[in-house]
Each structure stands twice: as structure tokens, then as C-alpha cells.
């Protein structure tokens, strides 16, 4: 234990912790650093050797943005779409290499309950493996399907905020820190838990105790002050703040929210803002710990959270707004205007008072007219506040005798029956029912028949009002315009039945105005206070039981999982080798393709329906499936046999070697045939030849490169030579053990390459951005050219020399 250790007595026990106040006494300049940096400071001090502490403290004092610090997660949270193939690979490696392979950090793997229940074959394969994995890997906890609160499980149930461990027979407390690949890791920042959303390879590394090295971050302080005016909802906060963050530019920075206005934002709404910050490229959107945080923990977990409060008070991180930031954004809740978005003007947020001025057509039909509301969809919000607010609008409307025109088709779209349940417990949902809103999981989006006929006959521009974020999509072929707004305003405009009025000033009906039916924040808070632990207890009491399908699955007691040959949805990837690469020796590798500039991940990994007469289609037919059982590519990429057959099979892909033919075709010069990439790779494998791709500039652009590089590796590609790479894609190639090389002065054209050349690369000198001479030879000539290694850091070099991240971690 280091010199900053301290202790406190609580509940008949002594707890030890790394005392930041001791640090501040010795280094007062650190006292006012942001709360998010205090979390990082504590973690770096706790995980440092004594001789490293001074260096760490100096980095924090000087805000050395060009220096690096550690990010040490205490827990990793995974969804099943990433976690399942990852643990399949672990299981395969354990079996083939006969090694003990378990995560070193606690893993929570959450199975998405929203997976279609009409997919028994897929579910059977996936769930049987996950259930086996939960019993055969240490430090792995699987949350099985059967929980409608999938996006919120970490926020509402799993997170503990504090961790404890035994060290020298002492209980040591420290803040929980999380990494993951989806929204579970970003939402948690609302709870005062630092959570980073990482790419798949970095998350994989974190599971095995590999410390994430990050650049010392800048922190943008977003001061929220003032109060929301009546008639506004949290949707308006989201839309206005979204524009602020977008204009300011927060990419690569931590966003930390603070100020008096934060106290009036519920924790669920804070979670929405945390996610919003990451949408604009921020490292995270962090909220410090305050009374709302502690109240939320006690409400959702049914525990006494006093020790959490005590810890953060002692660390100077409780309700502490007197801090210094690198940059500032001031956000005045009082100045917010209520806005709506029109599907015809996606880039423009329109103040609701200005909606009438945006309308251009005023034709009339027999039953309807232009700008009439004919479809109203109240999509349940992630925000409990917004749902209650909408119901209270309905309640007041009913009490005043208001009703909605029969021409308006009405739906209340819920993503969880628990939303319906808590609104029933609050005795609120009956008012939506009284106004004619049909409760559905997904809106069928039908129109009243006479309106449908009228709209077609008179070519009317009728509208839909919705609180669904997918408002820009076509809701109904007869509805030309969709207006996106808060759930409460959807109900208000439904009551009026037309968009051609200023809802802020004009009456909705006779002498009844928006202000008469819109609840105050006090009224909303009164209902919020009625939601207690019993609701969450009911949601989570059987969280690990799973649904009936899960419970019926029988798991083999064998410590090795049997990947049945009949499985068509899951197959492990045999692409990991535990071997060090001290030298490169590639002899007469075959060239698979010459590819254009700007090849992106969409070109590499196809999406959509699998059709017959393709490599994947033929494989599935061999497995006994009929074309109507093929499914879509995205659902079968957990099967290695599918991915390696699918990679590059974009019909518009251009391999210059077979030009003008398009698609994933290669030329077998030896047999004078044009064959598929997959067939070419199989022939190369049979003749024990490596494969090379030669490409133009910006190879691998766009997102989601994990599947792309995995597929390229599975296809047997060892080297990609390009004019330039997308930086993150290049990084991922290295992390899976593929060598990225860049041309220096020449390219395919200047070298006059034909594609029949074989490529030889030999060296014992593998170094950062070094140069290497390669040989290109065919029956008529031999050419030499220099290319450059694209290793930009020691970690990249280490990963490559160990054949990729996973192989590197296994070797350690």
C-alpha cells in the first residue's frame, strides 16, 4: 500500500482507501480538477508503483495532454452479439491448445431479450453455448434473456459504484470503472461511474487485465443552470443541448456536466445526456455523485447506500461543483425553446411557435385537409419523466372534457411492458386509453379508412406526429410529413388535430390553451416520487433465471463445448495461434486482388438477405437448408464458415485483375479460371501459399471494422499493401495479426503489375515504420520496390510480433 492510503470506520468495519484529500494537501493544484479526472487520478495512484507516483501526479498537475495515463477497468460489460463469438473463440483455443483461458476481470454478458422469439434454431445454438460458457469460465456472469429492461440493466441493477478487494487482510475500497462496446458503458457515467466505450479489440484486451493506455484527456465542463419553463419537456433539453455539443466540438474530450440545473435532472435523464455526449465523439458524458445518485441507487437496489456517499464525501467528489475545466459550455434551461423536427427538413430544428410559417399547402378534402394530424404515435421515452408528463397532459385533457378527432389514429408504443406496469401503478395509463391511444409494442401505422381515401383523392398533405426517433422514415405511404416532438406535445397536437396554429398562444379548443393541460415540474416530480424499489424488485428478482427457452436448454457437463456439425449459426474462428513472430518470411504469396481507393467496411462485409448461388448460399444448402431458411448475413456472422465465404462479396466490388467483371472474383492464372475469392483462398491454402491484397488509398474506411478484419484473416490474407490506410482499420488489422504495408513511391500502375506476380517478403528487422524491400515476380520479370511498415506505436509492434491481440494476451 502506498503513502496515500487512509482508512475510515463504518458499520463495525474498517475500510481502507487511497485518500485524494491527502494528495490535495500535498499538491493543492489538484484540488479543483474535474471529478472525472479525480476518478482517473485515484486509479492511477492505486495501480502504480511507489516510484511512478510522482510522475503520475505531475502529469495531472501540468495537464500534459501529450502524455499518457492508465485506464484500469474493474468490470467489462458485453452484449451477446460481441461476447458470444469472443467466448466461442476462447473455448476453441482452450480445447485445441489445452490451456487454461479465463478472463482476469469480472465480465457481465447481457443477452438481448429483443432477439426475435420466432428464431428457435438460432436461439438454440446461441443459448446452448452461452449457458455452457456461464458454467465453464470463471469471472463470467451471463444475464440470460427474459428482461425487457435490456439497455438499463447495468444502470439499474449491475453497477455497484464502489468495488472492494482484500489486500494484506484489509478491505480496500475504490471506484468502479467500466469498459464495454455499447450503450451500457456510456449510460453508466450518469451514475458517477466512469465508463468508456471501446472498440472490440481493446475491450477484449481489457478482459485479460491489459491496462488501457489513454492520452491525458481534456475536460469540457457543461454548466447547466436555470429551470425548464412550463410547456417544455426533457426532449427539448436533449435537442437543444445536442446542437450545443455538436457546434462546440467535443470529440476526444471528456464532457462533465455540473451546475445548479443538474440537481433538477433525474438520473434516467442524465443517462440520456451521457449517451448524447458520446454520439458527438466525446470520450464520455460524466455526472458527479450527488443526492440524486444516492437516492437512485437506494431506489433501484433497495439498499442503504450510505457507505457510497461517505466514500465520495471523503474523496472530495460529492456534490462538488467548484472545479476547473479546460473549456466551458454554459447551458441555460430557462432559455430553451420547445422545438420540433420535420421529416422534410431533417437538418432544421423548428420552434413550435414557427410551425405554421413552415406550412405551404392548404387544400381541403371531404373529411380531412392539408396539415391535419391523422396519425399520432406516442413512443415511450427512455425518460420516465417524459412518460409521466405525457400521461398528465392526457389526464388534464380528460378532466377538461377534451377528446381527439376520430380521424386521428392513435398509438402508445412501448418497448417494455414494465413501462405499462409502472404507469398503471401510478394510475395514469387509463387517461391515454380514455383519449383512444392503443397500447402496442410496435405501431401498425394504419390510417382511418375514410382519411386514407380522402388523402388519395385530393392529394392531401396530411401529417403524423410522433415521439419516435425514427421519425424520418416513412410511417405510411399516404402521410407525406412526419413531425417529431416530445410525447406530451404529440398528445397536445392530437387534441387540436392540425398543425396550422401557434400552440404556444392559440387555443387548443375554445378557451383551453396548452398551459391549461401541461403539468408543472412539481406535479411530475410528485408522481416520480411514488416509484419505489418494489417496481425494480419485481423487474430484477429473477434476472438470472432466463425465459422458458433458456431454462429448457440442457448443458453438457463436458469442459469442452461440442460445436455440433449441424450448427449453422455459430462456429468458432480458427485464426488464433500462440506464436511469436521474430522475422517475416512470406514466400511467393499469391495476389488475391487489386482493389480501388476508398474500400470501406461495407464493401468488405455484406449485409442483407443471403441469396442462392452464392458461396454462403451454397454452404447453407449443403447443410440442408432451403433458400427461405438462409436468413440475413448479419445473423450468421457468428459462424466462421459464413464470414469467410461472405467477405468482399459486394456485387459492385472491382478487382482490377478480372476487370471488367465485378464482384468478389479472382483470376487463377495457373488454371486460367476466374473463380470466387473463397475458392481462390481454398486453392492457396491447399498449395500452402499465403495471400496478399494490393489496394489504393484510404483502405478500410468507415466503422465496424472488427468483423471486416476478422473475415479477412479467416480468408487467409497475411499482408495488405496499400497506398494508405484508414488509421483505425490499420490498427485493427495489426490487432488480428495482418501485416499492413504502404507503398512509398510506387503503386500498382507505376509498377505495371498484372496480378500473376508472386510476392516475397523476407526480413528479420521488424520495427516501427521501417522500410522493407519486397519482391514481385512472374514468368517474365522480377521487380523490387520498397514499402513501409505501418506500425505507429510499440503496442502495435508487440501485437503484430505476437500474431495479434488475443494471441499476445494468451502468451502473457
Regions picked out by a protein language model, each given a short descriptive name:
Residues 1-812:
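Fe-S-dependent hydro-lyases/dehydratases of central metabolism
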